[in-house]
Amino acid sequence: MEEYQGYLELNKFRQNDFLYPLIFQEYIYALAHDQILKKCILSDNLSYDNKSSSLIVKRLITQMSQLNHLIISDNDSNQNTFLGHTKNLDYQNKMISEGFAVVVEIQFSLRLVFSLERREIVKSQNLRSIHSIFPFLEDNFLHLNYVSDILIPHPIHLEILVQTLRYWVKDASSLHLLRFFLYEYQNRTSLITSTPKKAISIVSKGNHRLFLILYNSYLCEYESIFIFICNQSSHLRSISSGTLFERIYFYGKIKNLVEVFYTDFPTVLWLFKAPFMYYVRYQGKSILASNGAPLLLNKWKYYLVNFWQCNFYLWSQPGRIHINQLSKNSLNFLGYLSSVRLNPSAVRSQMLENSFIMDNAIKKFDIIVPIIPLIRSLAKAKFCNLVGDPISKPAWADSSDSYIIDRFVRICRNIYHYHSGSSKKNCLYRVKYILRLSCARTLARKHKSTVRAFLKRLGSGLLEEFLTEDDSLIFPRTSSPLWRLYRGRVWYLDIICINDLVNHE
């Protein structure tokens, strides 16, 4: 019982830490300013003025430290100047958001370090890699039959987010200021997709670090109860469920839900019983797979719909949860199409004077890269049109030749690096062709020439980085003398984020 008590209880580590004073420290916003300047490989360089940004930080700290700016009434709510009306409003709001995120992340970082030390996990950075998910799928999904493709519902009400976060951050002053900032931020800017009920959409592209933290706290709360139910479904009546109900009651959930769970908990667990069940999530998409009948996943489907509605006041349409058979349908996840295929084979067997042939089918976990979404991402980044014909990149034409080539090659290498686990490399060859010709057309545009004349004048050696062996984009040539002989899938443990070109779900 102590094991499950520790699993569900609220973390009491460092409850007395106060984060509120950090909000008024200038170095926090300097750190946030550096984070803003880190752009993805597809974005142009951002020019900025260090002096003006420092003045903005000091002005923001002065405004936040004055109590009268934090008091809002019905009469003066429109005159509140906490966020101001300056020409740097977007940058100012973004920097405040990043500064809040740095402060809030402190508590989560302390909890993570404490958890890793307690569990004696040394190489925790390997667990952060996106590619670490796919070896797990390869090892376990071969024996599963059905999978639920789940889109986690949003938008979420601002107050629900703050209430969820307060179970992890114990500083009430910081949470009050955070609540004030969220409502002001929503009213003053268009960076948050809002609804009349003050709900925000967080999983869309371009959102800020702070809202991703709030969204992850909501996911952590949802998964802490959901995964507990999954883990306990195999124990049935032998496990006491009192701890679960205490936590649900503590969170102020609906009393009727608690009573139903308390009286019918063993029956509920029996309905969800499955010999093998696996759960995987990345961002706003999750997978629930089982080797049982589709009826089991249907039960989980309607349980999740009611769970989100009762606990987070979110209505999730049942159509957002798709149940597919792995042997007949592909799973679109993290830029890959994954499926379980049957490879037929014939085995000749001989016993004494009699011989016969046996048909045997071996399951294989197949992972490929869909070319159409990838071309759509290239078209969005202005490397080609919607049908995949390469075009020039006028925004880069003012740079030097070496800089243009290096930038195209770096994008190509990153795409190959992320999609190194694909069973088929044909689509990657197409991507390399598009980027190589787009690079040539960009250089020709810069020199006011045609592609043919430009390459003929300077020689094909100008693009030799694109003409190297394809596997060299995956394996460094100096890494091993056997790199040419290996043609299988490769998963990397250093990929912790997805850029726009591969985030095409």
UniProtKB/Swiss-Prot annotation:
Pfam families: Intron_maturas2, MatK_N. It comes from the Eukaryota. InterPro entries: Domain_X, Maturase_MatK, Maturase_MatK_N. GO terms for molecular function: RNA binding. It is found in: Plastid, Chloroplast. One of its GO terms (cellular component) is chloroplast. Its main location: plastid. Keywords: Chloroplast, mRNA processing, Plastid, RNA-binding, tRNA processing. GO terms for biological process: mRNA processing; RNA splicing; tRNA processing. Usually encoded in the trnK tRNA gene intron. Probably assists in splicing its own and other chloroplast group II introns. PANTHER family: MATURASE K. Belongs to the intron maturase 2 family. MatK subfamily. HAMAP family: MatK. This is Maturase K. It comes from Micranthes integrifolia.
